[in-house]
Swiss-Prot record:
NCBIfam families named among the record's database cross-references: frr
Lineage: Bacteria, Pseudomonadati, Pseudomonadota, Betaproteobacteria, Burkholderiales
Protein name: Ribosome-recycling factor
One Pfam family here: RRF
Main location: cytoplasm
Family membership noted in the UniProt record: Belongs to the RRF family.
Keywords: Cytoplasm, Protein biosynthesis
Gene assigned in the entry: frr
Species of origin: Paraburkholderia phymatum (strain DSM 17167 / CIP 108236 / LMG 21445 / STM815)
BP terms from Gene Ontology: cytoplasmic translational termination
Gene Ontology cellular-component terms listed: cytosol
Length: 186
């Protein structure tokens, strides 16, 4: 394994950690509506659970309302029940064959709770990135031990890995700050 492979592998893994963190953040509800909020909801479709996006069309009606239009009329009640029973605390209302899902405003207490969750998720993501840095540095040390590269090369590569780590940690911090801003905006 070469130094370039180690750096490239570390960067790819750090990017995956960042993507997973972004995905986790998208599931945290702010006061604003977005269709991604309902992505993880499973609907019972003829006896098997399927994602809501596979049985209905999701649209934004306005900044605080999601419109859900099941493709089959008989699925309206099932989809509405699945949304109501989700852990999001939403109260959907059906109007004919369209379900409107209004986003209730967040209470001050809930906002503070959510910012703590966001910070905690951010810390977890940063720890994952730092662990990847440690793994890359251990691989570099092994190359030195096996006399495949010099200590100077290891130091230079280690500095590059540190720069990557700093870049991803800064990106995570930025995402945390942005999400906190979204949550605290009334």
């Amino acid at each position: 394994m070469s130094v370039a492979d180690i750096k490239k592998g570390a960067e790819q893994k750090m990017q995956r950690s960042l993507d997973a963190f972004k995905n986790d953040l998208s599931k945290i509800r702010t006061g604003r509506a977005h269709t991604g909020l309902l992505d993880h909801i499973q609907v019972d479709y003829y006896g098997s659970p399927v994602p809501i996006s596979q049985v209905a069309n999701l649209t934004l009606v306005d900044a605080r309302t999601i419109g859900v239009q099941p493709w089959e009329k008989k699925m309206v009640a099932v989809v509405e029940k699945a949304i109501r029973e989700s852990d999001l605390g939403l109260n959907p209302a059906s109007h004919g064959d369209v379900i409107r899902v209004p986003m209730p405003p967040l209470t001050e207490e809930r906002r503070k709770e959510l910012t703590k969750v966001v910070k905690s998720e951010g810390e977890t993501a940063k720890v994952a990135v730092r662990n990847l840095r440690r793994d890359a540095n251990e691989q570099l040390k092994k190359l030195v031990k096996d006399k495949e590269i010099s200590e100077d090369d290891e130091r230079r590569a280690g500095d590059d890995v540190q720069k990557l780590t700093d870049k991803f940690v800064a990106e995570i911090d930025k995402l945390v700050q942005t999400k906190e801003g979204e949550i605290m905006t009334v």
